[in-house]
Curated annotation (Swiss-Prot):
Origin superkingdom: Eukaryota
Organism, scientific name: Thalassophryne nattereri (Copper Joe toadfish)
Name this protein carries in UniProt: Natterin-3
CDD domains per UniProt: PFM_natterin-3-like
Entry's localization field: Secreted
Family from the record: Belongs to the natterin family.
Functional note: Shows nociceptive, edema-inducing and kininogenase activity with release of kallidin from low molecular weight kininogen. The cleavage occurs at Met-Lys bonds.
Amino acid sequence: MKLSVLVVTLLAVSWTSAQPETFSIQTKEANMNPEPANIRVARSSSAQSNLQWNYWDGQGAVPDGAVSIWNGEEKRTDYVCSCGCSSGFYSTKTGANCHYAYGETEKTCSGFSILVNRDNFENLEWKGGSDGSVPKNAVEVCEKVYVGKNKYGLGKVHTKHEALFLPWHGEEHWYKDYEVLTVNDDVVKQELTQVNYKLDAAHPIKNPPETLRRSSASNSQCRPITKTVALEKAIQTEQSWDVTSTVTFGVESSITAGIPDIASATVSVSVETSLSVSLGSTTTKTTTHTVSVIVTVPPNHYCPVTMVATKYTADIPFTGKMTRTYRNGQKRTTSITGTYRAIQVGEIRADVQRCSEIAGAKPC
């Protein structure tokens, strides 16, 4: 059976499982505080994750949201960490190192990655496995290596070697039965609220006038006449709320927010409204517009009339709160950033062009 798992994208360094005992982030490059490495979730709902591997030197307070367990055997809190492709534990009671198992011994590294669940947003669960098996959405450290534990503490599940390996009092121990860290992706609803637009960063672009319709008023008589020309056109506008992360696709989504008006001299925001949307996708709206104009047409002339509209585009940064509701009733909320993108219509008018003689008209 093909397993659906979490894939770790490590951006700062390239780790291999061949020689993890030589790995150290105590290098000049690693100490430059590399960016957190996001964990990409490879699952049918295709969501980005709030899980991150954050570089940490073990000094000061443990990062907010660090993933931990209570180690009942040692009577302490252990945090999930990794040295290269080997996950293990960090504890405030054992010094500023990450402890991991490799080559039948317990090893440590003093610069390491610690697993952080920002805002405790991801619904993490420990699920059972054995003989190298891992459940759906298991947190992967490297290819075929996953975060695991048993009653003795944290370690790594290596599917190739069909066991959990963990450090214990200076030695490496392995077990055929274990638990694997997973992400619950059974989301049934997500809501975007508390949207705050950064209007000072909004710079709408006024596009050149666009001709939507053409018509004309003609007069074959020998006296001026007055005609009313009406033009009608269905015009499509677009808007989207693109969120940088945490969106779960394929589930019920809604947003409660004001709508920016970008088709004016000053950008303003309407009162809040609730919409059912597909976050990250563009929502379109089609509205039929009608304009009319009275034209005085000289004898034996025709006067072209055009329907002209001016469209505005803008990208506006925003912040907000994303709330997920799971099938089991749990709710998780996180802060998010994103960009509101819109195409709106401003002025719509009828333009009367210069009148011309009707070719071949009978002289008056």
